[in-house]
Amino acid sequence: MFSKNKHNTKFIVIACVIVVLILILFCFDFQNIQEIIETINQLTNNQNPSKNTASEMSGMRRKIIFFIFNFFGKIILASFIISFLLHIKKNAQIKRLKNKLSLWSKLSFHVSQIGEEVLNELPIGIVLIDISSQEIQWLNPYASFILKNPEINSPLTQINENMAQLISTSDTIPKTIITLKNQKFECFYKKDLSVFYLFDATEKEQIKHLFLQKTLAIAMIAFDNLAESLIRYDLSEQSQIQGEYLSALSDYIEPYESYLKQLIDDRFLLLLNRQNLDKMLENKFSILDTIRNISHKYQLKVTLSMGIACWNLSYEKLATYSQNAIELAQKRGGDQVVVNIENEKIKYFGAKIASLSKQSKVHARINAQNLVDILKKNPHCFIMGHTHTDLDALGSVIAFYKIAATIHPENNNYIILDEEKLDKSLIPVYHQLIKTESKKTLNIITTQQASKMIKDNSLIAVLDTQTKDMLNSPELLSLTPNIVVVDHHRATEEIIPSIFSYVESSASSTVELLVEVMGFLEKEVHITAFEASIMYAGILIDTNAFIYRTSSRTFEVASKLKDLGADAIEVKSWLRKDFDKVLEINKLISEMEIFMDRFAIIQSSEIYENRSFLAQVAESVLNIQNVDAAFMIAKIADNKIAISARSYNEINVQTIMEQMEGGGHLNSAATQLEGTNIKTVTDTLKHFLKLEYEKGEKNMEIILLTDISNKGKKHEIIKVNNGYGNFLIQNKKALLADKANLAVIKQTQILEQEQKRNHELLMQKLKQEIDDKKITLDIQLGPKGKIYGKITLKQISEEFLKVHNITLDRKKISLESEIIAIGIYPVDVFLTDQIKATFFLNVTERKSK
């Protein structure tokens, strides 16, 4: 391009010079023209022609003829010169084009060679498909090799399912990681060309995996109720029992290459990496069962709680996440492990017994005082419960309103209730409440009214739930930062941020907590008999008639409500089932399925808008002998399916429902799912039940793809039960030990052994290059010959690279002792477990300038 512009510039300069010369020549002709014109003017003005005039006329004709020939001659000359220049330019252009064509011919040959090499020689897999049939149309040799020589027109789904799934993704450039012949490949799909590109990403994925395995995890460990449980024992017995707990914990931690530090008597800090954390996850934290067995031995209510966080964050943030995790575990009742891993959903393990009550009169009084202080500072209080409001939610809302009204009798407290969001079974009771006491007495307002009244300094009280999605009016939370939460459900990771929370998962109900608070107020709280009946009904429903989560505190609160006028007969009438419901329940029970000889699963494709009906069905099934848990699965809307779960004894339906995006209590839980169907939900439920409770099944043989604690090493063939084996296979930690997989593993082992031999040969060669080499470091000495500062491994490796052009991994360099004086020191480099190279470091004094 530059050459072409330079040539054009030369041509323009020459053309300009020629034009200037022509103009100069024409300037001389201009003088002749002036003379001719003057002669004509003289002849015209001459009145007496003479002989001289005739001669002048003759001379003028000669001048005119000369001028014409001269003028046109110059024009012809100029035209010739211009034509000649144009011809030269054209020839130059033709020559340039010929040169370009020649160059392009040479380049095209090389480009063709390069393209052919890219397609056939470089380790880049290329697969062209027919987008309509999703069949392979062409693939290069490398792709053919790694895909095991598929035939043309083979369906892509038969070759690799992950590649087939990329076609339907909405990403701009869809990509995924696929495993072929024990190698990892990064697979890109170009939609406009219908072509796949495969790049070997084995090393990159190995580095990522290694980095992931070394990620730090911090665990906070606490013994629940340890101090309280040991009070009745003398000092020596306390030491013996506590020592048994600590020994069990220490024995459990020892195989995991971790660091355990006792902070206080019942609290510990554990440091480990992701690799060992994964082993704990596979083991499902058996320490929980061990601690539970020790407690059973001594008849103690002591359990273990752990909160684990594993993120690539600063130590401070990671410790905060770990602290939040153990707080969540204890809010959920203890006896469990909460694991928070980066980019993964929070996992829960354990919780096989009901929440242990940690509540005391002192604890209740402190919470009551904190709540009173907050209410005194915030005179405008807005109170709400969860959507599909039930009797416990309504009872707790009324109880909190009465507490707030006692502290601030100025009528600045409001109950937020939308009738359309009430549970259908509650509507008759709500209408009776309005008829008995009127909306004005209780200051009942709607969500729309509340949105116009709540200010930045107002207080919102959230009762009987901690989850924003479950709230009656979640949109109101953004109107003020002043939020308090009182609840008895086990906490989840999606709790509502609050300035104060009173959560006691061992309590029977939220009503129980609030009625206890009333006993610590300076003034007496006025509650009508009808309000007391609603609160009593809330406790009755949440405990299933005082069966679940019932303690002496529960009976104390129930007794107090009876004293306030609660009518048990009226409450019983509210809870009666109508005739049609009884028939429907019996019909559903007659069609139920008994799964694993202990779980009852009831399914219905009918739509039941009343969610409490599903709970009634599940509770009715529990009355059947040998049924440990019941799951009622049905639609509650066109595109929404609900499960109501109830259980006895050690069956924890809460953890099962949490795996299906729900939650609840140990023996009472539920979930709601959208965009699915009854069959899929049922299959998912069975899958989780099998994983958790399947035992004694026939064994299956599997090939381990990684080391698994207490099971075996990588590539080892072991026998496990079907449930655990399928779990390992699904998580890509094992393969079924069939002929095909055994052959693949055998070939892989051969390749790995070959790679190991090659690596050892390479390290032996590197050892020879390193051995007996010398480097020198000049350092500054103090007055007494001591070294200023410290010689680091980084300095040593950098100097070795500078002198010998060999890069050493600082982590593999070892010094026999710290360098504190000048001299010659041997430096070891551990290239492998078996190969060690040694060079010498000469430490000399830096000479002052």
Curated annotation (Swiss-Prot):
Membrane topology of this protein: Multi-pass membrane protein
Location of region: Large ribosomal subunit protein bL9: 681-849
Regions crossing the membrane: 11-31, 64-84
Taxonomy, superkingdom: Bacteria
SMART domains named among the record's database cross-references: GGDEF (SM00267)
SUPFAM superfamilies the UniProt entry points to: DHH phosphoesterases, L9 N-domain-like, Ribosomal protein L9 C-domain
rRNA processing in keyword set: no
GO biological process: translation
Keyword list, A-Z: Cell membrane, Membrane, Ribonucleoprotein, Ribosomal protein, RNA-binding, rRNA-binding, Transmembrane, Transmembrane helix
GO cellular component: plasma membrane; ribonucleoprotein complex; ribosome
Record localization: Cell membrane
Pfam family, one: Ribosomal_L9_C
Described purpose of this protein according to its UniProt entry: Binds to the 23S rRNA.
Record family assignment: Belongs to the bacterial ribosomal protein bL9 family.
Additional detail: The large N-terminal domain has 2 potential transmembrane regions and a GGDEF domain.
The protein, known as: Membrane protein-large ribosomal subunit bL9 fusion protein
